[in-house]
């Protein structure tokens, strides 16, 4: 497919066409996913769980993220590569900049940071220095111990109000994209309308500008055996992985995925 850039993603939002994203950790799947038309490949710190077998993303290091980003780059055929900054890799803006540089040198086009309004200073510094940032809000797995587990965020009105304000603040600080995880569908829709940058959802309903899933989840592979509510197994009824990836792209584009049963209410 033609090379996907940040401008491409903003254009898709402007046209009302959904953006497709999947996690990806190696060259083989990068080639398969990009050939299927997946526009954004997320080198997620979820690799700590699905590849390394940890029970959280916390043990993943920046060096490991750079290694997998480089692998994805070698197989990619035109998708935009988004890489996660792992746990405690952005404790200060300066530390964040150094670690972002490592990931971008490995092949990332954009960096994803987990957090809320407190990230504004860091995002502003990164944006000023040429690092496009995707801010990850809602359920942020790196803070799972503070959140008390993997729970839907934003169900209480005060929390929802704060999340809306934080999204606007992060866009104003220079965030180029938002990712909302496990957020009530109605709240995700409101945030998507409140900002001009693309908003990607996972467990956030179908009114966001695009969708992302963990690659292994949508292929029916689960190390733990637990399948999140927002996941659909796209291998069902498909002859091969390439067909499953293409089915995911089609379902996101025609808004048949996610369906109502994949989302959360307030």
Curated annotation (Swiss-Prot):
Assigned EC number: 2.1.2.11
MF GO annotations: 3-methyl-2-oxobutanoate hydroxymethyltransferase activity; magnesium ion binding
Keyword set, alphabetical order: Cytoplasm, Magnesium, Metal-binding, Pantothenate biosynthesis, Transferase
Predominant location category: cytoplasm
Compartments, as annotated in UniProt: Cytoplasm
Residues annotated as the enzyme's active site: 181 (proton acceptor)
The record's free-text note on cofactor binding: Binds 1 Mg(2+) ion per subunit.
Known cofactor(s): Mg(2+)
Coiled coil spans: none
Keyword Metal-binding attached: yes
InterPro entries registered for this protein in UniProt: Pantoate_hydroxy_MeTrfase, Pyrv/PenolPyrv_kinase-like_dom, Pyrv_kinase-like_dom_sf
Enzyme class: transferase
Record: residues binding 3-methyl-2-oxobutanoate: 45-46, 84, 112
Residue positions binding Mg(2+): 45, 84, 114
CDD domains reported for this sequence: KPHMT-like
Pathway the protein takes part in: Cofactor biosynthesis; (R)-pantothenate biosynthesis; (R)-pantoate from 3-methyl-2-oxobutanoate: step 1/2
Biological processes, Gene Ontology terms: pantothenate biosynthetic process
The keyword Cytoplasm is annotated on this UniProt entry: yes
Pfam families cross-referenced by the UniProt entry: Pantoate_transf
Entry GO CC: cytoplasm
Its biological purpose: Catalyzes the reversible reaction in which hydroxymethyl group from 5,10-methylenetetrahydrofolate is transferred onto alpha-ketoisovalerate to form ketopantoate.
Family label: Belongs to the PanB family.
Assembly with partners or alone: Homodecamer; pentamer of dimers.
Name the record gives this protein: 3-methyl-2-oxobutanoate hydroxymethyltransferase
Organism name: Pseudomonas putida (strain W619)
Organism placement in taxonomy: Bacteria, Pseudomonadati, Pseudomonadota, Gammaproteobacteria, Pseudomonadales
């Amino acid at each position: 497919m033609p090379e996907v850039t940040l401008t491409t993603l903003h254009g898709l939002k402007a046209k009302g066409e959904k953006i497709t994203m999947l996690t990806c950790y190696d060259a083989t799947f990068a080639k398969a996913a990009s050939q299927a038309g997946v526009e954004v490949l997320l080198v997620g710190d979820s690799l700590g769980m699905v590849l390394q077998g940890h029970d959280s993303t916390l043990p993943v290091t920046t060096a490991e993220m750079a290694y997998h980003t480089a692998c994805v780059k070698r197989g990619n055929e035109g998708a935009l590569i988004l890489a996660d900054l792992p746990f405690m890799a952005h404790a200060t803006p300066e530390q964040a900049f150094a670690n972002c540089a490592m990931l971008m040198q490995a092949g990332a086009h954009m960096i994803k940071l987990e957090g809320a309004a407190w990230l504004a200073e860091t995002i502003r510094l990164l944006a000023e220095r040429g690092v496009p940032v995707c801010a990850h809000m809602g359920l942020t797995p790196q803070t799972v111990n503070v959140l008390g587990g993997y729970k839907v965020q934003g169900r209480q009105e005060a929390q929802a109000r704060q999340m809306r304000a934080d999204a606007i603040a992060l866009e104003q600080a220079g965030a180029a994209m938002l990712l909302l995880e496990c957020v009530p569908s109605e709240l995700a829709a409101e945030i998507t309308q409140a900002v001009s940058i693309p908003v990607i959802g996972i467990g956030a309903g179908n009114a966001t500008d695009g969708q992302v899933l963990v690659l292994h989840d949508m292929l029916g592979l689960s190390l733990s055996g637990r399948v999140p509510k927002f996941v659909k197994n796209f291998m069902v009824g498909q002859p091969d992985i390439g067909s499953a990836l293409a089915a995911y792209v089609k379902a996101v584009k025609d808004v048949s995925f996610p369906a109502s049963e994949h989302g959360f209410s307030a």
